[in-house]
Amino acid sequence: MSFDTIIQFENASIFIHDHLVLKEVNFTINKSEFVYLIGKVGSGKTSLIKTMNAELPLLEGEATIAGFILHHIKPRQIPYLRRKLGIVFQDFQLLIDRSVNENLMFVLKATGWNNKKDIDRRISEVLEKVGLQHKGYKMPHQLSGGEQQRVVIARALLNDPEIILADEPTGNLDPETSEGIMNILSEISQSGRAVVMATHNYNLLNKFRARTMKCQEGRLIELENREIDFAALEE
């Protein structure tokens, strides 16, 4: 594994309980890489992301992510792994009874931050990165869908993760708002973090070109870097 490699899977099999979802999974992802995961519903995209997050155990094969060996990881190590990962999902999962600032403060305190000045500074930093520096006082219901997803991205950045795992982050958003989210994720990748994004939105895939892997018939296939054939992808 090279110095720049941040994720590596070797001959891995991905399971949900006893059900084999993907087999012979082999790939590496480097720092600053942006990688799409595509495929039909149920093809294994989310299961692969959950394996990276140690939500699903790696039962066969080998994998290393952010310096943690997934096939040997112990339960007490999982919280430390997850501090190196920023998670962005389609459903925003914000605490609806707390303001934006309070949502972010909750995560920081839960991960060991206790100095108020440091907490306030970090919240300001991540909100500025996503263009919401003046929205910290608002409640989630006062924000648009795109703004709520920006808060989720800000939340994912709080502990300065090495990797962003995004599962359908634009799934509930209109095209213009989706492009804004993609611009933010692209900037995050350019800042040195790896970004892995599962998506069905092939229009974004075509507009924001990046390395693409497809879950298909129980395998993970690397697609050539060429003009994307939408009809072929839908098969």
Regions found by a protein language model. Give the residues of each.
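Helix-to-loop junction immediately C-terminal to a conserved catalytic motif
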Residues: 53
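Conserved ABC transporter NBD signature motif
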Residues: 61-69
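Short coil-to-helix segment of the ABC ATPase nucleotide-binding domain corresponding to the Q-loop/switch region
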Residues: 97-106
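Conserved ABC ATPase signature
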Residues: 139-143, 147
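A short, proline-enriched helix->beta-strand linker immediately N-terminal to the Walker B motif
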Residues: 158-162
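Catalytic Walker B motif of ABC-type/P-loop ATPase nucleotide-binding domains
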Residues: 164-167
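Helix N-cap at the start of a conserved alpha-helix in ABC-type nucleotide-binding domains
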Residues: 175-177
